[in-house]
């Protein structure tokens, strides 16, 4: 197999350099044997595990484990200073809100874990954790930090750890890579690369592929696998190229060290002096290169190898990289599914190894023929965002809601800005890149926004011996236990668990600081309803003690209502206790004079004891706050307060108060008390008690109640008050109102009287109007009586038709004649007398005279009073009396208008015309008499001619029909006789 021409030794047969750990757990190096070679030690867990107790919160911890929360955290164990503890307590008491994170020292590890050696690398996998030390020892533990085994892997510091779940791999400064099995401690293999290894990654299915990727100080990204003969084949994926050094700009064959190698599917990304490089393995094409910024915090020419890059895979296609003070977010566009791998530092995920297929992906790399036919990459890498943070990053992990948790060392931005200004002014400042290692500074944890780097939260963490540590001595890892993520802050000789505060932690934090309301709010999710209520009660009682009535009013109902809603329906005793406490606090507020503020918050359901509601209403009534009194007797159910007591009190106040005018609206007057009393009576359906007050208050609701409840018979003595309810003026002015106004204003009372016609007779109502009502009520009586007209009950007013005629003659003359024509149960003579006494009732008199046969009197009235010839003629025609014609002619001969009207009447016989003409006096002046007579003659001639023609027609038709009749009579008839008829005739003749 051939590789790049510039590196002819990139493919090596390393079989001679590969060392296998035998069953005696010793390492044999055939090429480089150290005189002080150490055997690989596998320590039993029982030898390195100290006594461990289970904490109450479910996290395994030692009895001396310390928990630290706050913004300035001291996580050191052992000799804690009492004064420092007191200061911390005071600082925490000053805080209003709990910290976002809590810190717990991890003490499950062996006692000598940090004492004899210091940690150089970490791995937090899904099923186990691994810790490498500077002496080359690898500690494997469970996710609860219970030791699994300890292995002596290397002769010097372990710089990286990786796993595929079944196998683990470590890389060391000593230039070796150790790969071992988690199941078989004796199955350990060593690979010697002769140069320090900074990063190593196993294939996701290493057991089958035996493939891994590594890189280090040699500057090569090496893919190692076994060929078909079983020999190890190393393939350098990055070409060796000339580079310019920063000192002399001279070309050099030296490549910068590989600081980290990570893979996503069949993509590999690595970090070196050239920055961040993404490479597609099948095509060996570089997809993207992002140079490492040469300036960090005003320090020029910063070497990338001073800082370890830290990579975290957010999703299968998104990766975030933190390096120095820079953070990049990349997105990879995949065209097919593939498993991800990654390797390197403490935040690497164990199961993200590249999904290489040894027979396809790598085959293209091994075949020289295939290498000349490299395809086009089927994926791309995009930089989504890039920003810098004010810290040197030594670890990062995803947090919640598109946030990043970053471990590092803070940089004073103000100081750096000052330096920038001084540099602009020409002042000479020199900072060496090595100073950025921040040795002796305490590390910080920051939560920043993933897309813009905005700082959200900041904590400084004081770890053991931090004064002696630098940036590369810290590690940050993440592990998700079921659903709760945990973060681990590891230094060379200390380990701290970092967790987001749970609801229970928040609850305890608030309780310690007596912030009962906040504890009560969170308690909904962490404690029972009864215990939570006791905390809420503590908060309310504390407000009572402080006399903070405003806050008490604001929170009172919130606590009690939520408590009642959360209680079980069977918790009767607890519910009653809650209601009792609720009532007690409300009564305290009432006593303190905060009734107006607390009244709207007093619950209607569930109901408290009656005394609470009574106290509020008594207060409003005693202080003449009638509007408030009305508001709450309207809002509250009658069962909540002592209704009868308030009814009695209002009755007493009404009796004691002076009777105000109808227009009085002042609170405290008896009309206001009466309104509230009526309201209570009506809510209790005590209508008989409410109506007298409604009548006095002239409240129209009385009409509705009397109508619906059919109570009018009980209040006949107050019929005048009932009728006058809708009327606001003086009684004497009623007579001045028109019938229309009467019907409009008194519509409801009249309807009420009419609807009770079957229970209260018309006679009774008429009697009341005649004897008990003012004379001005006659119009109302008239409107009441005519209400019966055109109804099925019109017979009820038959006895009062004479009275109606008189009322019609006074108030509605236009309707009198139709009434006379339609009804017959009145005394005609009395009606004639009434109509005769009233001027202008001529039509009515004419009708009445005609009704009794006095047609001549009626006709005389028409002629003398109405002077209406046409009406007189129509009157005579309707009666059809010839004598009446004679009377009209004789009575009208001296009246030209009437004479002319009779002569122009075209439907009468000529005899009338002759009588009129003959009876006319010679001096009678009639307009157009000649034309009238001429017209009469023409009409008569025409009539005669028409009659003659009709006679001829009739005679002709008569003759025709007579001749036909005679002809028919003179003709014989033909009869058909059957044989049966002949036989019958013969028999009859024989008999005869």
Swiss-Prot record:
> PANTHER family, from UniProt?
VACUOLAR PROTEIN SORTING VPS41 (PTHR12616), VACUOLAR PROTEIN SORTING-ASSOCIATED PROTEIN 41 HOMOLOG (PTHR12616:SF1)
Q: How does it assemble?
A: Component of the HOPS complex which is composed of PEP5, VPS16, PEP3, VPS33, VPS39 and VPS41. HOPS associates with phosphoinositides and the PX domain of VAM7. Interacts with VAM7 and VPS39.
- How is this protein named in the record? Vacuolar protein sorting-associated protein 41
Q: What else is known?
A: Present with 1170 molecules/cell in log phase SD medium.
Q: Where is the composition biased (Polar residues)?
A: 1-30, 41-56
Which organism does this record belong to?
A: Saccharomyces cerevisiae (strain ATCC 204508 / S288c) (Baker's yeast)
Family (UniProt)? Belongs to the VPS41 family.
* Sequence ranges of the WD repeats: 114-152, 153-192, 194-234, 240-280, 324-366
Q: Which UniProt keywords apply?
A: Phosphoprotein, Protein transport, Repeat, Transport, Vacuole, WD repeat
Q: Which GO terms describe its molecular function?
A: small GTPase binding
* Sites bearing Phosphoserine, chain numbering: 26, 53
Instruction: Report one GO cellular component.
Output: HOPS complex
């Amino acid at each position: 197999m051939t590789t790049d021409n510039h590196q002819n030794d990139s493919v090596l047969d390393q079989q001679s350099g590969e060392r296998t750990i035998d069953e005696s757990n010793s390492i044999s190096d055939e090429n480089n044997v150290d005189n002080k070679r150490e055997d690989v030690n596998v320590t039993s867990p029982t030898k390195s595990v100290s006594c461990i107790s289970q904490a109450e919160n479910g996290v395994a911890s030692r009895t001396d484990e310390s928990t630290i929360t706050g913004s300035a955290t001291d996580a050191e164990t052992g000799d804690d200073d009492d004064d420092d503890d007191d200061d911390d307590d005071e600082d925490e008491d000053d805080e209003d809100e709990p910290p976002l994170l809590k810190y717990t020292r991890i003490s499950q590890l062996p006692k000598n874990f940090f004492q004899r050696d210091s940690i150089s690398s970490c791995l937090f996998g899904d099923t186990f954790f691994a810790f490498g030390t500077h002496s080359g020892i690898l500690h494997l533990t469970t996710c609860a930090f219970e030791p699994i085994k300890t292995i002596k892997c290397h002769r010097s510091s372990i710089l990286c750890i990786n796993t595929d779940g079944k196998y683990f791999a470590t890389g060391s400064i000593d230039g070796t890579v150790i790969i071992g099995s988690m199941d078989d401690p004796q199955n350990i293999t060593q690979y010697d690369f002769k140069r320090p290894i900074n990063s190593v990654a196993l294939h996701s299915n290493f057991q089958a592929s035996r493939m891994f990727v590594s890189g280090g100080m040699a500057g090569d990204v090496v893919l190692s696998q076994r060929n078909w003969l079983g020999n190890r084949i190393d393939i350098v994926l990055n070409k060796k190229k000339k580079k310019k050094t920063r000192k002399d700009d001279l070309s050099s064959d030296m490549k910068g060290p590989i600081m980290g190698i990570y893979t996503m599917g069949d993509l590999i990304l690595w970090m070196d002096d050239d920055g961040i490089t993404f490479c597609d393995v099948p095509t060996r094409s570089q997809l993207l290169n992002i140079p490492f910024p040469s300036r960090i915090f005003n320090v020029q020419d910063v070497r990338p190898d001073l800082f370890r890059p830290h990579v975290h895979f957010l999703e299968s296609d998104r990766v975030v990289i933190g390096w120095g003070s820079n953070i990049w977010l990349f997105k990879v566009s995949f065209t097919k599914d593939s498993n991800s791998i990654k390797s390197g530092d403490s935040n690497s995920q164990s199961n993200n190894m590249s999904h290489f297929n040894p027979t396809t992906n790598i085959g293209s790399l091994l075949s020289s023929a295939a290498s000349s036919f490299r395809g086009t990459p089927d994926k791309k890498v995009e930089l989504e965002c890039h920003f810098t943070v004010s810290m040197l990053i030594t670890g990062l992990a995803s947090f919640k809601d598109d946030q990043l948790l970053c471990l590092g060392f803070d940089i004073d931005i103000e100081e750096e800005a000052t330096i920038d200004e001084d540099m602009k002014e020409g002042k000479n400042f020199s900072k060496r890149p090595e100073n950025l290692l921040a040795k002796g500074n305490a590390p910080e944890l920051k939560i920043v926004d993933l897309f813009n780097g905005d700082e959200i939260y900041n904590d400084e963490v004081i770890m053991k011996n931090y004064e002696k540590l630098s940036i590369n001595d810290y590690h940050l890892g993440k592990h998700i236990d079921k659903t709760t993520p945990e973060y681990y802050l590891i230094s060379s000789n200390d380990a701290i668990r970092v967790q987001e505060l749970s609801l229970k932690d928040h609850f305890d934090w608030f309780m310690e600081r007596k912030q009962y309301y906040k504890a009560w709010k969170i308690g909904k999710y962490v404690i029972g309803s009864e215990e939570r209520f006791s905390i809420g009660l503590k908060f309310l009682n504390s407000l009572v003690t402080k006399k903070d009535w405003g806050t008490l009013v604001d929170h009172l109902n919130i606590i009690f209502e939520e408590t009642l809603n959360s209680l079980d329906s069977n918790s009767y005793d607890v519910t009653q206790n809650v209601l009792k406490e609720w009532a007690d606090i409300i009564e305290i507020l009432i006593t303190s004079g905060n009734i107006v503020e607390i009244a709207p918050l007093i619950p209607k359901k569930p109901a408290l004891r009656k005394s609470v509601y009574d106290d509020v209403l008594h207060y409003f009534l005693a202080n003449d706050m009638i509007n408030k009194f009305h508001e709450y007797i309207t809002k509250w159910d009658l069962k909540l307060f002592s209704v009868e007591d308030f009814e009695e009190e209002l009755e007493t106040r009404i009796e004691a108060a002076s009777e105000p005018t109808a227009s009085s609206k002042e609170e405290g007057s008896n009309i206001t008390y009466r309104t509230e009393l009526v309201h209570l009576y009506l809510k209790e359906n005590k209508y008989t008690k409410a109506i007298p007050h409604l009548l006095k208050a002239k409240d129209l609701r009385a009409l509705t109640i009397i109508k619906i409840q059919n109570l009018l018979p009980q209040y006949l003595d107050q019929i005048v008050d009932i009728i006058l309810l809708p009327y606001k003026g003086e009684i004497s002015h009623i007579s001045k109102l028109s019938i229309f106004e009467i019907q409009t204003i008194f519509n409801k009372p009249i309807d009420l009287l009419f609807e009770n016609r079957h229970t209260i007779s018309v006679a009774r109502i008429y009697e009341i109007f005649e004897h008990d009502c003012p004379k001005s009520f006659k119009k109302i009586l008239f409107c009441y009586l005519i209400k019966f007209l055109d109804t099925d009950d019109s017979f009820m007013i038959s006895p009062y038709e004479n009275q109606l005629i008189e009322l019609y003659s006074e108030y509605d003359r236009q309707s009198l004649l139709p009434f006379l024509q339609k009804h017959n149960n009145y005394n005609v003579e009395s009606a004639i007398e009434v109509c005769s006494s009233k001027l202008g009732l001529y039509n009515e008199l004419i009708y009445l005279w005609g009704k009794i046969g006095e047609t001549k009197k009626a006709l005389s009235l028409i002629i003398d009073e109405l002077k209406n010839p046409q009406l007189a003629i129509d009157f005579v025609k309707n009666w059809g009396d010839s004598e009446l014609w004679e009377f009209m002619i004789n009575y009208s001969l001296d009246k030209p208008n009437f004479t002319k009207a009779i002569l122009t009447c075209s439907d009468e016989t000529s005899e009338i015309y002759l009588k009129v003409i003959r009876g006319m006096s010679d001096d009678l002046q009639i307009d157009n008499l000649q034309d009238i007579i001429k017209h009469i003659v023409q009409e008569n001639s025409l009539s005669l001619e028409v009659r003659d023609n009709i006679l001829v027609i009739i005679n002709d038709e008569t003759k025709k029909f007579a001749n036909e009749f005679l002809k028919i009579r003179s003709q014989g008839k033909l009869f058909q006789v059957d044989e049966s008829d002949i036989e019958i005739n013969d028999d009859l003749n024989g008999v005869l």
